[in-house]
Amino acid sequence: EDVKPNVTPLRWMIDNGYQDPRTLERRAKAMEEWLTNPTLLEPDPDAKYFKIIEIDLNEIKEPLLACPNDPDDVKTLSEVTGTKIDEVFIGSCMTNIGHFRAAAEVLKQVDGSLPTRLWVAPPTKMDEHQLTEEGIYNIFGTSGARTEMPGCSLCMGNQARVAANSTVVSTSTRNFPNRLGQGADVYLASSELAAVSAALGKIPTMPEYMKYMSEIDTMSDEIYRYLNFDEIAEFIEASDRAKSIPLTNIQNVA
């Protein structure tokens, strides 16, 4: 159920001029072939692991953040509560479409302008398109968020950068010194926690966080639903068009 919907966007990419069409079509055909007889990777029966780490999720009672500027320096929310936040980045490959819907639900609860500078960058153009169709981008615009071109954006720090010496909450993968901005202190957090921090201008307390999350929890099925490309007319039509492009008529070569 996770593989089948993702054949469609590969052909959508072909229809929209992405390179290389033959490579994309080969991948699509390989996925379709696998779907006729799906098999999963399994470890050898006698496999020996270097290390086995067991994490009891029942012991995690509150959100976790990676602190400036080391992704391994992890603390609980209560340990960093109240830290003033200047900028917030919600984006990069660590996010999916549900995270942006959740962030929008947080922003809808804010009266007036945000006390922070908020950056938003969906990971793909497909996410951007669907979020626009759903009206989520209108919510970002009303809140004053800066919407970036889909992709890495602040995560790489080469398309744009936060203000020097600012304190930031980010959903990106790393927070090494000077990566997002010169002298910036960067916390790594979930999209939901990042959105609440943007709304408050600080890292929230647990009660503040739970207040915002209570609204999201009631709509979780709708917010976090997958983007099933094979059920969206525009993507289906583009996929069908791509199948007729001569460059995608791939033949296996012995």
Task: Map each language-model feature to its residues.
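Fe-S-dependent hydro-lyases/dehydratases of central metabolism
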Residues: 1-254
